[in-house]
Design a protein with these regions (language model features):
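Core of compact, soluble alpha-helical bundle domains
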Residues: 1-149
Length: 149
């Protein structure tokens, strides 16, 4: 018999700023770099710039998206085109990326900024997949539908 009052519930704070984003991204990329679907496309992160070179750029990106920090300039499309030329990205890559992102956010944070991080990630994944492949992605649509975003 389970006593609901005795079962601890974890309450998470919302993403509050750069330090939280750094922690989130380090955890997320730690998972992505060993994932059986995502590790190959992320080889360049691992081998060329390393995680320590990649994280500040991605932290700038997400801090700009979530907090309007104005730190990220440019477009992520050229980098993804290079990856796509080397390792063709398919719907499964974007669906796994989003699933991993949403799970990582949900395990670490909760609140309106966290929700925005998930909805923006879904929007970016859908748009990037469409730009790279010219196709819709039913698998990604299914992730969005089931991920409460």
């Amino acid at each position: 018999m389970t006593d609901a009052a005795a079962t601890p519930t974890q309450e998470y704070a919302d993403i509050g700023g750069r330090a939280d984003l750094e922690e989130l991204l380090r955890t997320f990329y730690g998972r992505v770099l060993v994932d059986d679907v995502l590790s190959v496309p992320f080889t360049q992160v691992r081998e060329v710039s390393g995680l320590d070179g990649h994280l500040p750029v991605m932290t700038d990106f997400w801090e700009t998206v979530l907090f309007h920090a104005g730190l990220y300039r440019g477009s992520p499309l050229p980098v993804h085109l290079t990856v796509h030329d080397r390792t063709p990205l398919a719907g499964r890559h974007f669906a796994r990326w989003l699933t991993t992102w949403v799970a990582t956010v949900d395990e670490m944070f909760a609140g309106p900024v966290s929700h925005k991080a998930k909805t923006e990630a879904a929007r970016f994944a859908w748009a990037m997949h469409r730009r790279l492949t010219g196709e819709n992605n039913p698998e990604l649509d299914a992730v969005v539908a089931t991920a409460r975003i």
